[in-house]
Structures are given as structure tokens and as C-alpha cells.
């Protein structure tokens, strides 16, 4: 196993993370001011990183030791080897290539917002489901969730995570267009990025019932005005905003 070590944090290096996965990274780990990207062998990358060969057992043991439960009240996101005795609702997620382990601000913002806005029995769309953590959380709150993702590689992991948590959301390969025939939905949650939210704003309205709610995150603070303008133009009314670090969540009503 080879590690490509970059100075910085996952948040600071967020713009280049897709390029690491496109280059063949099997996973990422933030540790002591660095981001480690794991590869089966060195490849040419256009970044200022350093390659280092590590033993599979060495890095895996260190990674497991450093990975802590992630609190997002009323939830806690756990790896399968974690134990937890608190009162929070457990979400057991196998860390891997799919986004959504609870260690990123946007995932925590979305989990907390789900708890505030989801009503038991709601039909929920998780757009860009990744690990399935938001769809799983919606089911645990009494919703009926559909998770969609354009990356077919993440869906088996999402399904395995759902089974691990004893819930049965439906997962589907595709974009928002693929989800529309299963709607309209009472609640939409999407952890994407500002420009895509802005482009999809009219389609979000189409996906929701009258009075439905849209929870949008993956938005950097300085890009939030773009989303606000697009959602207002699509006829949405603002419900709330929440922030953590450099990231925001914007909630809207249809």
C-alpha cells in the first residue's frame, strides 16, 4: 500500500479530492495536519505531495485507532468496530470511498437538519447519497427514504450500511431525473455544491410536494448567495440557515 501525503486538512484540500479519487485513491485520512491518500501503487499526480510505502496492517491499525465517533445530535456516526453507550441514535457506517462518515461538517449539518425538519412518515429524497448515511438517518427518524447517486460504485456500500443499521431505504443509480418518477417528496436533502444546487433549483421544486422542504448543504459560505438567489427565483421561501466552519446549510420550504 502506498500513501500520498499532502499538507493541509480535508476541508482545505476539498477542491482536489475528486482528482485524488480519479487518480485511483482508495481512501483518505486526515492526520496531524496532513491528508493521506491511499493508493495500491504510485501514480502521477499534479499536486505537491510525497509518496511513502506503508504496510497494510500498520496504516489500517493506526487509521482505526485515530477514527473517532462523530457526534451530530441527535445522532452519533460510528464505525463497525466502535462501541457507544450514549443516548444518541447510532448510525453505523463502514468508512470507505463513499462520502458521508460524519467527520465532515456538511454531513453533520445535514444530519442535524434532518432531525429538525423530518416528520414521521415523510417521503425523503437523499440526492447524492454516497455512504447512505442521510437516507439511513431519515429512516431511523421514521421517514421513507430513497437515496440516489450517479456513482454506481457507492451503492453496494450504501446498501450494506443500511443493512448494518436495520433499515431498508431504497437506493438507485442516477441523478435527480431518475428520482422524479418516485416522487413527489416531502423532504429533499442534498449534500452537493453551490453551483449544482443553483442549477437544480427549479427541479427541486418539481421534486417536492407543496409545503415540502429542501435541505441543501455542501455550500461554502462565500458561495451561499448563489444558492439563495437561485432558490428564491424558483419560488422557495427560506426556513433557516446553519453553519459549521466554512460550510453552511440552507433550508427552504416549497
From Swiss-Prot:
Reactions performed catalytically: L-lysyl-[protein] + 3 S-adenosyl-L-methionine = N(6),N(6),N(6)-trimethyl-L-lysyl-[protein] + 3 S-adenosyl-L-homocysteine + 3 H(+); an N-terminal L-alpha-aminoacyl-[protein] + 3 S-adenosyl-L-methionine = an N-terminal trimethyl-L-alpha-aminoacyl-[protein] + 3 S-adenosyl-L-homocysteine + 3 H(+)
Subcellular location: Cytoplasm
Keyword DNA-binding: no
GO CC annotation: cytoplasm
Disruption phenotype: Mutant contains unmethylated protein L11. Null mutant is perfectly viable.
Main location: cytoplasm
EC number(s) per entry: 2.1.1.-
One GO BP annotation of this record: methylation
Keyword Magnesium: no
GO MF annotation: an example: protein-lysine N-methyltransferase activity
Pfam families: PrmA (PF06325)
UniProt: S-adenosyl-L-methionine binding residues: 107, 128, 149, 175, 191
Record-stated family: Belongs to the methyltransferase superfamily. PrmA family.
Function recorded in the entry: Methylates ribosomal protein L11. Preferentially recognizes free L11 before its incorporation into 50S subunits. This function is dispensable for growth and thermostability.
Protein name: Ribosomal protein L11 methyltransferase
Amino acid at each position: 500500500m502506498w500513501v500520498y501525503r499532502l499538507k493541509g486538512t480535508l476541508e482545505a484540500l476539498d477542491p482536489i479530492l475528486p482528482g485524488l479519487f480519479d487518480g485511483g485513491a482508495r481512501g483518505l485520512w486526515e492526520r496531524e495536519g496532513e491528508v493521506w491518500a491511499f493508493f495500491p501503487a504510485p501514480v502521477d499526480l499534479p499536486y505537491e505531495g510525497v509518496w511513502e510505502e506503508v504496510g497494510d496492517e500498520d496504516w489500517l491499525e493506526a487509521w482505526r485507532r485515530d477514527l473517532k465517533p462523530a457526534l451530530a445530535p441527535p445522532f452519533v456516526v460510528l464505525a463497525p468496530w466502535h462501541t457507544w453507550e450514549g443516548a444518541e441514535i447510532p448510525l453505523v457506517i463502514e468508512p470507505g470511498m463513499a462520502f458521508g462518515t460524519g467527520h465532515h461538517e456538511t454531513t453533520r449539518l445535514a444530519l442535524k437538519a434532518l432531525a429538525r425538519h423530518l416528520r414521521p412518515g415523510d417521503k425523503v429524497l437523499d440526492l447524492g447519497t454516497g455512504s447512505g448515511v442521510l437516507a439511513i438517518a431519515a429512516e431511523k427518524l421514521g421517514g421513507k427514504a430513497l437515496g440516489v447517486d450517479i456513482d454506481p460504485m457507492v451503492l453496494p456500500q450504501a446498501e450494506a450500511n443500511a443493512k448494518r443499521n436495520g433499515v431498508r431505504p431504497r437506493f438507485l443509480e442516477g441523478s435527480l431525473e431518475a428520482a422524479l418518477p418516485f416522487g413527489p417528496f416531502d423532504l429533499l436533502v442534498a449534500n452537493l455544491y453551490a453551483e449544482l444546487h443553483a442549477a437544480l433549483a427549479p427541479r427541486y421544486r418539481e421534486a417536492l410536494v407543496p409545503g415540502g422542504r429542501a435541505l441543501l448543504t455542501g455550500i461554502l459560505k462565500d458561495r451561499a448567495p448563489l444558492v439563495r438567489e437561485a432558490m428564491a427565483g424558483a419560488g422557495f421561501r427560506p426556513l433557516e440557515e446553519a453553519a459549521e466552519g466554512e460550510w453552511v446549510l440552507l433550508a427552504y420550504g416549497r
